């Protein structure tokens, strides 16, 4: 089975929504950066604006700015899809708020764990604690991935209307690269236990 099918081989730019959650989990949450980048790249023409996807992706790491970038992309996805007659609905406002709150909570959790380990020393990092941290990571990555399902569904409807092609059921080379990269993080986490 060829895992590298994409729109150039007769498939739309859509992505099975479940893949978003799976990719979120398996890439240690890093797939989200690619997801936002890919959508800025693909919607640049549809919006008719001089969007710079790389700069916006870097902006995801800048507090405050990232809030506006995330909210704007969720709104743009909804607006462009509606212009093409998409009937799927999601609240870009509530999706943005939930995504930002969860992302912030995960960042705070990570900082608190790091500060605690620095203060108390690495000897406090027991296998049980590592497993607990990994389960919390899994929970956050799952929830963040689930929040991208609704925007992905409306994107799929948009691409179906615009391109008239079937949705691909395979991963792109970029998605496979993120899986490998994220897999390394999971591997490092597991061998630490």
Describe every region a protein language model picked out:
Residues 1-61, 65-113, 144-186:
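Membrane-interface extramembranous regions at the lipid-water interface
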Residues 102-144, 185-193:
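Membrane-helix interface segments in multi-pass membrane proteins
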């Amino acid at each position: 089975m060829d895992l590298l099918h994409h729109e150039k081989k007769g498939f739309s730019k859509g992505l099975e929504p479940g893949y978003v959650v799976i990719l979120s989990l398996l890439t240690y949450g890093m797939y989200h950066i690619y997801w936002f980048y890919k959508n800025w790249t693909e919607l640049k023409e549809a919006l008719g604006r001089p969007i710079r996807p790389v700069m916006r992706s870097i902006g995801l790491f800048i507090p405050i700015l990232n809030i506006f970038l995330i909210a704007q992309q969720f709104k743009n996805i909804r607006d462009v899809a509606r212009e093409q007659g998409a009937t799927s609905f999601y609240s870009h406002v509530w999706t943005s708020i939930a995504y930002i709150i969860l992302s912030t909570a995960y960042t705070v959790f990570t900082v608190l764990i790091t500060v605690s380990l620095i203060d108390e020393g690495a000897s406090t990092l027991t296998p049980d604690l590592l497993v607990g941290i990994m389960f919390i990571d899994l929970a956050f990555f799952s929830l963040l991935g689930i929040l991208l399902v609704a925007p992905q569904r409306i994107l799929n409807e948009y691409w179906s209307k615009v391109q008239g092609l079937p949705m691909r059921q395979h991963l792109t080379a970029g998605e496979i690269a993120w899986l490998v990269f994220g897999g390394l993080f999971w591997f490092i986490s597991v061998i630490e236990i």
